Amino acid sequence: MKSNMFTARQIQKMYDFFSSMPWFWEIDAITCRATENSSYRAQAIKLLELDSTHRVLDVACGTGLNFMLIQKYLKNQGSLIGIDVSAKTLNLARKRIGKNNWKNIELIQTDSASYQTEALFDAALCTFAIEIIPPYRQTIDMMIRVVKPGGRIAIIGFKQSSWGYFKLFNSIFKGFSVVFGGVDMNRDVRGYICANCREIFYNEVYGGFYYILVVQK
């Protein structure tokens, strides 16, 4: 199958452009059931089994829509590192942090595959992004590398639906996702990460167009 290949620079420019219109992300989150109160985010984060002592990495954190749910467990303690390639998107995340007076979050602009750290994480997550990040295998490798043995990694990703009549909308969903997100659904994310980690949970949601995957290192 031909893969939708965007370069890291193209993705960065796309998301900087969208972030110059903050209302875009609000509409996108509501339409795609991906708000900061999303049941999909809540389920994935719950399965990370976090507590207030933990150090967590949010890969491609975007505007910070995972932060509220993560803070439910960290309780403004522990440590949360959010990384993203888009500076303008991170600016929106900083506003969210300031609005909520969170003191335990650090934001870093970086290509996720290139991120390095000496201190390991108790858990990592990447939501609605692993099919967008161009070097996705290297990003998965990075998450595995920086998580402690026994730590968990959660992913919410995009896929073609295999659910009944929802399959009729596959081409529309794929086209929309490419144009407004740079999504490449031809990636075998589950197979790649499960070759190196133990699968804890897998479930398809949103008409079969999303999946929630949690693994343990």
Model-flagged regions — what are they?
Residues 2-49, 65-69, 92, 169-176:
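Conserved class I S-adenosyl-L-methionine
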Residues 9, 28, 33-35, 154-206:
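C-terminal alpha-helical "lid/dimerization" subdomain adjacent to the S-adenosyl-L-methionine
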Residues 57-59, 63-114:
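Class I SAM-dependent methyltransferase SAM/SAH-binding core
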Residues 75, 133-134, 147-148:
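Helix-to-beta-strand junctions that scaffold the AdoMet/dcAdoMet cofactor pocket
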Residues 113-124:
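A short acidic, Gly/Pro-enriched loop at the edge of an enzyme's catalytic core
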Residues 123-135:
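A short SAM/SAH-binding and catalytic strip from SAM-dependent methyltransferases
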Residues 137-149:
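A short glycine-rich, Lys/Arg-flanked "PGG" loop and its adjoining helix->strand segment in the class I
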Residues 213-217:
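C-terminal lobe and adjacent flexible extensions of AdoMet/dcAdoMet transferase-like proteins
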